[in-house]
Swiss-Prot record:
Descriptive protein name: Fibrinogen beta chain
Subcellular localization: Secreted
Gene this protein is translated from: FGB
Role summary: Cleaved by the protease thrombin to yield monomers which, together with fibrinogen alpha (FGA) and fibrinogen gamma (FGG), polymerize to form an insoluble fibrin matrix. Fibrin has a major function in hemostasis as one of the primary components of blood clots. In addition, functions during the early stages of wound repair to stabilize the lesion and guide cell migration during re-epithelialization. Was originally thought to be essential for platelet aggregation, based on in vitro studies using anticoagulated blood.
Maturation and modification: Conversion of fibrinogen to fibrin is triggered by thrombin, which cleaves fibrinopeptides A and B from alpha and beta chains, and thus exposes the N-terminal polymerization sites responsible for the formation of the soft clot.
Native organism: Vulpes vulpes (Red fox)
Top-rank lineage group of the source organism: Eukaryota
């Protein structure tokens, strides 16, 4: 599940973290 709650730049890091 991916969380795009962060900024566009941090969104990429968030996706890997949400894994």
């Amino acid at each position: 599940e991916y969380y795009d709650d962060t900024d566009e730049e941090e969104r990429i890091v968030s996706t890997v973290d949400a894994r």
